Amino acid sequence: NHIIAWFGRLALAMGPLAALLVYGFWGYCYIPVFSGVLALASFVLIAMVRFPFKAPSEKMPLFSLDRFFLPQGLPLFVNLILIMMVVGVLLAQVHSVTYYAMLLSGLAMAIVAERFAFVNAELKSEVLTGIIVLAAAVLMEFTHQARALNYMQPAMIGFASGITGSRFLLFYLKLSKHCQRGTSQSSFFLAWETGISLGFLLKFGFLSSDSSRVPYACLGLLVISLGLYNFFVHPWYMKHRNR
C-alpha cells in the first residue's frame, strides 16, 4: 500500500514534467498522443496482473461502498481534502520544467525524511510539519521572488505533500477493520485526488481574475486544516484506530 501510494505521489510531478518536455520538443499536438500511449501501457501492465478469484459473500447488496469508500474514515477524508486543495491551487498556476523538477526533488526529500527523521517521531509530527511547511511555501507568494518561487516553493510543496500523504495513508490503514485495507486505500486516493481537483476548481473558477487572492485563500484553508487536525481529527483517530 505504501509503495503504490508513493508512485502516485511521484507521478504528481513526473506527469506535468513529461508534458512540458514533450511540448518543448514536439509541440502541443503530441501531448494527447503521449498521454494515450501512457494510458495504453498502463492498461497492458494492469492486464498482466493475475488476481485470484474470490467468491462474493452470501448477502451481496445492490449498492455497496466496499472497496471504494471507508465510512468510518470521514474525518480523515475531509481533512486531507482541505490540505490537498492548497496543493491543487498552487499547482494550477503557470509553471516551468524547473518547477516540477524541484517538486520531484521535494518528494524525494520526503522519502528520506520518513526513513530517518520521522521514524521514531511523535505520531502527529508528520502532518503538523507538512502543514507548516506548506504554509511557508504559500507565504513565498508574497515575496514575488522568481528564484524562491521556482526552486524553494515547489521543493517545499513536494516535501509537505509527501510526508502528509504518507501519514494519512497509514492512518487510513490502521483505522480499517478486517479485509478493509483495499477500501481504506481507495478512500485515501479519492480524498487525495478530490482535494487536488477542488484546488484547480478554486483557482480557475474563483481566483483566476485576481491572483493576489491565492495566498490568502491557501492560508485560510491551511489554518482550518491545522485546527481541524490538531484539535479534532488526531484525538478522534487515537480513540477509533484498530491497530
Q: What does each model-identified segment do?
A:
Residues S42-F77:
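Flexible interhelical linker loops that connect adjacent transmembrane helices
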Residues Y99-L134, W192:
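Transmembrane alpha-helices of Major Facilitator/SLC transporters
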Residues N1-L20, F189-F200:
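Glycine-rich segments within core transmembrane alpha-helices of 12-TM secondary carriers
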Residues A18-W26, A117-F118, L202-S211:
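Interfacial helix-cap and linker-helix signal at transmembrane-aqueous boundaries
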Residues E122-F168:
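C-terminal transmembrane helical hairpin of 12-TM major facilitator-type secondary transporters
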Residues C29-M48, R213-P235:
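Symmetry-related core transmembrane helices of the 12-TM Major Facilitator Superfamily/SLC fold
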Residues N1, G162-K177:
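Intracellular juxtamembrane helix-capping segments at the cytosolic ends
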